[in-house]
Amino acid sequence: MTIKVLIIDDSALIRSLLTEIINQQPDLEVVGTAPDPLIAREMIKQKNPDVLTLDVEMPKMDGLDFLERLMRLRPMPVVMISSLTERGSEITMRAMELGAVDFVTKPKISIANGMHEYSEMIADKIRAASRARLIARKPLTPVAGGAGLPLVGNPLISSEKLIIIGASTGGTEAIKSFLMQMPSDCPGILITQHMPAGFTQSFANRLNALCKISVQEAKGGERVLPGHAYIAPGHSHLLLARSGANYVTQLDDGPPVSRHRPSVDVLFSSAANNAGKNAIGVILTGMGKDGAEGMLKMKQAGAYNFAQDEASCVVFGMPKEAIAMGGVDDVSSLNDMPGRVLQYLAANSGRALRV
């Protein structure tokens, strides 16, 4: 069945390029284009599209205002089209909070060539969006003094324990939901979320303002500390390494792995090699199979692994593949998972195991 797409963008060039890219796919069809949200409102009623692509910054009505109204009145899958700027990344993070499924970045130079290089990725994101489960967003407020789940036992966790997280489509909100429930003395956390360079810094800043723990973009060489989360930068793979008795972050700008840089498989494999039984793996919502092989390696090295269940995923791709490959010990909803991870830690942290 053909997926019907409506393009909303004030740039005639972007409307033309997206139409060409989308219509080249046998299962996708552009049913209309609109230069602004006001025209788009009528077209949505007429054309009944399956997926919208929406420019982040537009005249007449702001893309975020339109998205907020759309999600309140007529929820549907939306893929944001964003500029590779700090402002663009911050607006895109807000769009994900409002309910957008995913986003595509416009190249800074040579837009036509750049967009065509992204054509397969754009098509994949639209397909995933058409199947996405739209999840009602709750308004978020920064965490106050005692928020976060309580730790069982005191002190619960030695600095040897680690939580290793991978996610893709829908992952920005899933990671936020997970981290907001982490107490300030939880183990160190390493995260790979598929996201372009520049956006990971905005993502880390937003999480840092909302969470009880400290959240930062990994720079490489940091000692991994309890109560801290380190997010892979969009330009490099993030790895876990050892430095004497300590765990440290390591960056690698080598080629994509499993079609991605940063890659979840790279992070998970490094955790298998360097943390073994001290690691807890978490695979969240996402398209594709990045992370499935790495999670199996973690399990074989003695880690205990959690996967997000289908009902709470925006896209049940990466968790499904990890479960099918046999690397998952516990499948749970996004709401339940932080508590289950902390329960597991409480039951298994009498003493961290040296590897």
Swiss-Prot record:
Homology family: Belongs to the CheB family.
Top-rank taxon: Bacteria
Protein name (Swiss-Prot/TrEMBL): Protein-glutamate methylesterase/protein-glutamine glutaminase
Domain CheB-type methylesterase span(s) in chain numbering: 156-348
Residues at the active site: S168, H194, D290
Protein location: Cytoplasm
EC number: 3.1.1.61, 3.5.1.44
SMART domains for the chain: REC
Organism: Methylobacillus flagellatus (strain ATCC 51484 / DSM 6875 / VKM B-1610 / KT)
Known function: Involved in chemotaxis. Part of a chemotaxis signal transduction system that modulates chemotaxis in response to various stimuli. Catalyzes the demethylation of specific methylglutamate residues introduced into the chemoreceptors (methyl-accepting chemotaxis proteins or MCP) by CheR. Also mediates the irreversible deamidation of specific glutamine residues to glutamic acid.
Keywords: Chemotaxis, Cytoplasm, Hydrolase, Phosphoprotein
UniProt-listed Pfam families: CheB_methylest (PF01339), Response_reg (PF00072)
Domain Response regulatory: 4-121
NCBIfam families registered for this protein in UniProt: PRK00742.1 (NF001965), PRK12555.1 (NF009206)
PTM comment, free text: Phosphorylated by CheA. Phosphorylation of the N-terminal regulatory domain activates the methylesterase activity.
